[in-house]
């Protein structure tokens, strides 16, 4: 009888967690023994794992009272167990049918070119063409006859000699139904072979599975959704036809501590249903001069089998460079330096060094992942793109040029309603005029303050003896000024940091908001009867409003600085004129301290959590509107220049007045 845990966790959650741990323990053992070729032991482990998976899934966790983080974690474990159960059952069915064992045994034999079919009436219905009677003799491959053909064999394990009832020179025979172990998705006609399912069938079957199915710590480094083909090379040297263009991705595991426990590589390459483990400086990869990447076929566990990966020439250059860079980091990538056609065999030659034998190439495909050229130094890519050898034959064909790839549709410029552009330009123009008016008004106000202060000082009678201010008071005010100034700088630094974080978060959130927000917008707003988008027009107006508000806000800041500087300077001058230089200096420190306190209070108000959320939302909106902004910064630059000139002029005047006051006091 199962006991309740001390922390009050329900017994059902404990059962699910125990079933989860035991199930994956047996599944991992089954995977390890399966990779070692111990099929019977692997089946026993798989069956035990399925039992624990069924036990964990059988417990209901969807009742209304099952709430809280514990039940949420349990539901996630059950979902993962369901996905694992499907995969384990599929693998167990394959093992029980003996497909994997038969495939491995058949590969030990030399594959033939054409399938062996019952001789029915095919030879009588298809008379031998005259052109085949004079065909050249066939080349011998390991003692068996084979015909040189452009088409190749996708499943060499099921190949055998042609029927003796047909001449040896006859073309391959076709049957209305697929032979045992094969599937057909096409049918023959008088004009050629046609697919019976269409392009959608292949596209739907070439989509990458979810990343979560590979592991919780799986990290996808690159994903090419389409335009990648693979072909297979058997031990006899025969090459299969390229597969239908599919996806490619490279995945690495973040938790390296589990690699030895689960007996898994640090990462792997996946091209459709084919997987290749990637171990830095150990997994051999050869880039051919013909444009293909060659890998040992480790999934078949048979020596001499290779897989070629071909990238379409229509793929972006950045994807190709990233793919090569990742291979360089995660495998033992090498270049085919020369293609020797004179001897009619493909040799991977390194200029100035001896050539590796074919036995060395075959040994590289074993489980120990030996190096391709034993005894030689590595020939690796240097820089971003490796250069092709100078003596490469000009007759070589780049295989990537024949791989079809879906073209990327060009983005058409959005058609905006006429009213949106007019309103946007009017908003920007009005904001520019308002900002200019604020700066100009502040300049006039500053001059008026200066005139008023001068007239006030003319009516004031200075004290006969300057007021003596205690040095302690002066020093205290000076220290207060320095302290408040430092606080203002620190608070400003913190505000800048908060703004930087908010900007980064806002930029990351903007694409998601735009993606999911567009789903909530009715189609009537996305496009009207004239083909124009009212929503885009409204976004342009909103972006212009943000630009206009920013322009007006900058004008307000410039105007406020001008007025505060003028008021502060004239106040200090008036006190200095009336009570002497020492009193004026003390007043100057006090006014600066008051200004610093105000700035610090304003900055602290913008550091809190609410301010952070507000800034993040604001930056998200700004990022969304970046594509709709209309650049019009000429007037803004003029306003800032005028404000800066005005502030500099005021500071010069203040400096002159301070010097004059010091002379009078002396």
UniProtKB/Swiss-Prot annotation:
Residues 431-503 are annotated as: Required for localization to lipid droplets. Ubiquitously expressed, with highest levels of expression detected in adipose tissue. Residues 190-380 are annotated as: Ubiquitin-binding region (UBR) domain. Residues 146-156 have a biased composition (Low complexity). Ubiquitinated; ubiquitination does not require ITCH and WWP1. The modification Phosphoserine is found at residue 470. This is Spartin. It comes from Homo sapiens (Human).
């Amino acid at each position: 009888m199962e006991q309740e845990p001390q922390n009050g966790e329900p017994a059902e959650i404990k059962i699910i967690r125990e079933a989860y741990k035991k199930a994956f323990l047996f599944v991992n053992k089954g995977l390890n023994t399966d990779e070692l070729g111990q099929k019977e032991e692997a089946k026993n482990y798989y069956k035990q794992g399925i039992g624990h998976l069924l036990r964990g899934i059988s417990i209901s966790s969807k009742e209304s009272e099952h709430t809280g983080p514990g039940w949420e974690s349990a539901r996630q474990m059950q979902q993962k167990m369901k996905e694992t159960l499907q995969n384990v059952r599929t693998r167990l069915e394959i093992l029980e049918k003996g497909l994997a064992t038969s495939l491995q045994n058949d590969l030990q034999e030399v594959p033939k070119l054409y399938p062996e079919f019952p001789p029915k009436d095919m030879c009588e219905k298809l008379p031998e063409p005259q052109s085949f009677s004079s065909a050249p003799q066939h080349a011998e491959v390991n003692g068996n006859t084979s015909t040189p053909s452009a088409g190749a064999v996708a499943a060499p394990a099921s190949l055998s000699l042609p029927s003796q009832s047909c001449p040896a020179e006859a073309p391959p025979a076709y049957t209305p139904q697929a032979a045992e172990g094969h599937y057909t998705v096409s049918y023959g006609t008088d004009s050629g072979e046609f697919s019976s399912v269409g392009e959608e069938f292949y596209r739907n079957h070439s989509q990458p599975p979810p990343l979560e199915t590979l592991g919780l710590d799986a990290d996808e480094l690159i994903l090419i959704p389409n335009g990648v083909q693979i072909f297979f090379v058997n031990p006899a040297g025969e090459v299969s036809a390229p597969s239908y263009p599919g996806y490619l991705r490279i995945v690495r595991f973040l938790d390296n501590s589990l690699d030895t426990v689960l007996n898994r590589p640090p990462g792997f390459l996946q091209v459709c249903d084919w997987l290749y483990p990637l171990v830095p400086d150990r997994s051999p990869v050869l880039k051919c001069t013909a444009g293909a990447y060659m890998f040992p076929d480790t999934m078949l566990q048979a020596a001499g089998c290779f897989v070629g990966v071909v990238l379409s020439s229509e793929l972006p250059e950045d994807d190709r460079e990233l793919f090569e860079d990742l291979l360089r980091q995660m495998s033992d990538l090498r270049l085919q330096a020369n293609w020797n056609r004179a001897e009619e065999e493909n040799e991977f030659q390194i200029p100035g060094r001896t050539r590796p034998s074919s036995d060395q190439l075959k040994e590289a495909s074993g489980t120990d992942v030996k190096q391709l050229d034993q005894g030689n130094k590595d020939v690796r890519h240097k820089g971003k793109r490796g250069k092709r050898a100078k003596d490469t034959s000009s007759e070589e064909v780049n295989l990537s040029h024949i791989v079809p790839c879906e073209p990327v549709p060009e983005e058409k410029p959005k058609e905006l309603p006429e009213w949106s552009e007019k309103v946007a330009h009017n908003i920007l123009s009005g904001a520019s005029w308002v900002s200019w008016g604020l700066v100009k008004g502040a300049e006039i106000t500053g001059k008026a303050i200066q005139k008023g202060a001068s007239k006030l000082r003319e009516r004031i009678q200075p004290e006969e003896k300057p007021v003596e201010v205690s040095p302690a008071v002066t020093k205290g005010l000076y220290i207060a000024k320095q302290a408040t100034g430092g606080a203002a700088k620190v608070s400003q630094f913190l505000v800048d940091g908060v703004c930087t974080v908010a900007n980064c978060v806002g930029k990351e959130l903007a694409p998601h908001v735009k993606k999911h927000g567009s789903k909530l917008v009715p189609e009537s707003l996305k496009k009207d009867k004239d083909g124009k988008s009212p929503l885009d027009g409204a976004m342009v107006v909103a972006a212009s409003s943000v630009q206009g508000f920013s322009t007006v806000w900058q004008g307000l800041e410039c105007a406020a600085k001008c007025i505060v500087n003028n008021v502060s300077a004239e106040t200090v001058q008036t006190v200095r004129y009336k009570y002497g230089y020492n009193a004026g200096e003390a007043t100057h420190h006090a006014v600066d301290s008051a200004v610093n306190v105000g700035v610090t209070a304003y900055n602290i108000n913008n550091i809190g959590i609410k301010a952070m959320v507000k800034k993040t939302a604001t930056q998200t909106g700004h990022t969304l509107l970046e594509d709709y902004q209309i650049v019009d910064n000429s007037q803004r630059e003029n306003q800032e220049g005028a404000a800066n000139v005005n502030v500099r002029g005021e500071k010069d005047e203040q400096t002159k007045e301070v010097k004059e006051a010091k002379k009078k006091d002396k």
